[in-house]
């Protein structure tokens, strides 16, 4: 670690952000701004599991004759939260619409992980202001991760007074009450809980499709990487009980779903909060191997918690797919230390070795940040060399974006933007080079494809994904949508494969 990095790290841990005048009177008394000091205070209170969600009689037909619209930003967790909110709206009697002009309620389900995502939300709120003028009865709401940031709520209260309601990630189940309050209140209704929520089971859902489904296995994150806002916006780690997860997946399988993605901010930490049983992600995956469903995958994993038992179970195959998304963020041990990732370059490479030994055909993908405070040219080159050594199939790459309230935001962001862009360009060139090399190896191979639907670029072509998450385009009857088929790969591109159908749907044993 060089001297600049050591000083920056010390400053991040010691400096305190000045409190600004805000609108905290609008918050419930339990709300606290997202600061490292407060957010690290993980309470020892037992997480309650509520299994009796239901709508009181006062909400029956509450939304009859009304329509709702939800715009979702961010990760799969947000997408799944939107499915839950759509389920609650539908239970209230609302109908969905794809037009804000037709909607009686517009919700923006937001993402806080990068500044660009927040800018998009405030831009959309600006567009909705004109719609509110034309339709004063329209209810506009902001929910999701941005709502957990007090500075964001302050900005909404100051500059976006046409917003009727703001609520966070921990109280989605209270949507009916929030809607009712917003409908009859002259002021913006703000219901944001800093205290992490309980685990609410049996919430209604309107799933996006009938082929693949997302299933939450846990909520929150306790890792506190210095650049990441998620531990503040999603709260402490809380795991669902295994019996509830297995029951939900069995129900989805019985209803014809072919693929399940297990969701969590850090799925590898699943079960670490259980006090009555020793049960982790490896144990859950071992039980899910016995469920009659074609594919099980998970996201997102943290290298720190990726244990040998999980690797052993994944090596058994079956319905457990060979694709693993394993964010590394940097190839430099010094940068990883400043990021508080709690593993080294050597640890990561050893983990990759174990995975490839247990699962010889494993496909690995990753996330990488460039331009983190004080990142040197040499440290960036370590990231490039690690990428080559692992041989990732692809990566999500990002320029570092400071998030207010995180330790990294207190570090001096002293890597010039032109340097950040140049590094990102070089990294992306490497990502693209390896991606086409990896895809070229599929030429002539026959792969199993789960058919999602029509190609976005050509309705005469079908598109689907392999077990290793490769997009495959091919011509076939639309009756095969939702089926598992065999496709011979005839051509490879950087981000997709082309092929020919070689046989009828596969029977899943």
UniProtKB/Swiss-Prot annotation:
Main location: cytoplasm
Cited NCBIfam families: miaB-methiolase (TIGR01574), MiaB/RimO family radical SAM methylthiotransferase (TIGR00089)
Localization (cell): Cytoplasm
Entry protein name: tRNA-2-methylthio-N(6)-dimethylallyladenosine synthase
Cofactor note as given: Binds 2 [4Fe-4S] clusters. One cluster is coordinated with 3 cysteines and an exchangeable S-adenosyl-L-methionine.
Domain TRAM: 440-503
Enzymatic class: transferase
Gene coding for it: miaB
InterPro entries, sorted: Elp3/MiaA/NifB-like_rSAM (IPR006638), Methylthiotransferase (IPR005839), Methylthiotransferase_CS (IPR020612), Methylthiotransferase_N (IPR013848), Methylthiotransferase_N_sf (IPR038135), MiaB_methiolase (IPR006463), rSAM (IPR007197), rSAM_horseshoe (IPR023404)
Region Disordered, annotated ranges: 1-26
Residue stretches making up the Radical SAM core domain: 207-437
């Amino acid at each position: 670690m060089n001297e600049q990095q050591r000083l920056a790290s010390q400053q991040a841990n010691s400096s305190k952000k000045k409190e600004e005048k805000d609108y905290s009177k609008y918050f419930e008394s339990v709300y606290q701004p997202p600061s490292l000091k407060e957010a690290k205070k993980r309470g020892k209170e037992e997480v309650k599991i509520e299994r009796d969600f239901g709508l009181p009689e006062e909400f029956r037909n509450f939304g009859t004759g009304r329509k709702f619209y939800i715009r979702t930003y961010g990760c799969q967790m947000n997408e799944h939260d939107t499915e839950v909110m759509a389920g609650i709206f539908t239970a209230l009697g609302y109908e969905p619409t794809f037009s804000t002009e037709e909607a009686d309620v517009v919700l923006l389900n937001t993402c806080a992980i990068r500044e660009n995502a927040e800018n998009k939300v405030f831009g959309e709120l600006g567009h909705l202001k004109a719609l509110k003028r034309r339709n004063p009865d329209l209810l506009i709401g902001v929910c999701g991760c941005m709502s957990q940031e007090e500075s964001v709520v302050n900005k909404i209260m100051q500059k976006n007074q046409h917003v009727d309601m703001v609520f966070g990630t921990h109280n989605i189940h209270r949507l009916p009450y929030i809607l009712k309050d917003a409908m009859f209140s002259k002021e913006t209704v703000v219901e944001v809980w800093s205290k992490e929520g309980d685990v609410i089971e049996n919430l209604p859902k309107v799933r996006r499709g009938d082929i693949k489904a997302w299933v939450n296995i846990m909520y929150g994150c306790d890792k506190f990487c210095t650049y990441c806002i998620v531990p503040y916006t999603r709260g402490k780690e809380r795991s669902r009980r295994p019996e509830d997860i297995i029951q939900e997946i069995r129900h989805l399988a019985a209803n014809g779903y072919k693929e399940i993605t297990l969701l969590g901010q850090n799925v590898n930490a699943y079960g670490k909060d259980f006090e009555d049983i020793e049960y982790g992600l490896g144990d859950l995956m071992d039980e899910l191997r016995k469920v009659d469903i074609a594919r099980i995958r998970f996201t997102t994993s943290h290298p720190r918690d990726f244990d040998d038992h999980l690797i052993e179970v994944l090596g058994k195959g079956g319905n457990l797919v060979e694709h693993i998304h394993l964010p590394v963020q940097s190839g430099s041990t010094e940068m990883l230390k400043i990021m508080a990732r709690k593993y080294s370059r050597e640890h990561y490479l050893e983990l990759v070795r174990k995975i490839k030994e247990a699962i010889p055909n494993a496909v690995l993908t990753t996330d990488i940040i460039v331009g983190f405070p004080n990142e040197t040219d040499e440290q960036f080159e370590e990231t490039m060399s690690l990428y080559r050594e692992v041989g990732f199939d692809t990566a999500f790459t990002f320029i570092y974006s400071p998030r207010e309230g995180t330790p990294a935001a207190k570090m001096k962001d002293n890597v010039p933007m032109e340097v950040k862009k140049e590094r990102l360009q070089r990294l992306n060139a490497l990502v693209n080079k390896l991606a086409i090399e990896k895809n070229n190896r599929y030429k002539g191979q026959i792969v199993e494809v789960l058919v999602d639907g029509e190609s976005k670029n050509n309705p005469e072509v079908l598109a689907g994904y392999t077990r290793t998450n490769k997009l495959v385009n091919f011509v076939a009857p639309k009756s095969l949508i939702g089926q598992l088929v065999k496709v011979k790969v005839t051509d490879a591109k950087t981000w997709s494969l082309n092929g020919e159908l070689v046989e009828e749907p596969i029977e899943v044993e």
